[in-house]
């Protein structure tokens, strides 16, 4: 009589939605960084987080950026953004298609449309 004990371990990715929520949290807390050079002619040695008067190195888990994002609300031919002015939005949607987000605080006009069509109904 013999006994056998097998232990198998594996790594598993979290659910995609959990990853999305974690990235969204990181994005909302992302911090601006500046490169620090050892001398004028060298490449940057490391990045530092600039907050008012204090500087610190970012941690490995920090999400950082070196340039501000363009303003996607306004048209910008350089970045290729067409802006949101004049686009249709969904007044009841809380998401990206909703008027509150898409209109960037400029306000919006509501219109009611009546559409008639032949349904090819047979009685």
UniProtKB/Swiss-Prot annotation:
It is found in: Secreted, Extracellular space, Extracellular matrix. The keyword Thylakoid does not apply. GO terms for molecular function: cytokine activity; frizzled binding. One of its GO terms (biological process) is neuron differentiation. Gene3D superfamilies: 3.30.2460.20. Pfam families: wnt. Glycans are attached at residue 90. GO terms for cellular component: extracellular space. Palmitoleoylation is required for efficient binding to frizzled receptors. Depalmitoleoylation leads to Wnt signaling pathway inhibition. A motif (Microbody targeting signal) lies at residues 121-123. InterPro entries: Wnt, Wnt_C. A lipid is attached at residue 1 (O-palmitoleoyl serine). Ligand for members of the frizzled family of seven transmembrane receptors. Probable developmental protein. May be a signaling molecule which affects the development of discrete regions of tissues. Is likely to signal over only few cell diameters. Belongs to the Wnt family. This is Protein Wnt-7(I). It comes from Eptatretus stoutii. The gene is WNT-7(I).
């Amino acid at each position: 009589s013999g006994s056998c004990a097998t232990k198998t371990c594996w790594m598993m990715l979290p659910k995609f939605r959990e990853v999305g929520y974690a990235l969204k949290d990181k994005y909302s807390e992302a911090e601006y960084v500046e490169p620090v050079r050892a001398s004028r002619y060298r490449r940057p040695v490391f990045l530092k987080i600039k907050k008012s008067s204090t500087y610190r190195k970012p941690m490995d888990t920090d999400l950082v950026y070196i340039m501000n994002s363009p303003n996607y609300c306004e048209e910008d031919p350089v970045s290729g953004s067409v802006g949101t002015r004049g686009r249709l939005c969904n007044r009841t949607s809380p998401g990206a298609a909703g008027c509150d987000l898409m209109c960037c605080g400029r306000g919006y006009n509501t219109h009611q449309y009546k559409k008639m069509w032949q349904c090819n109904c047979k009685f």
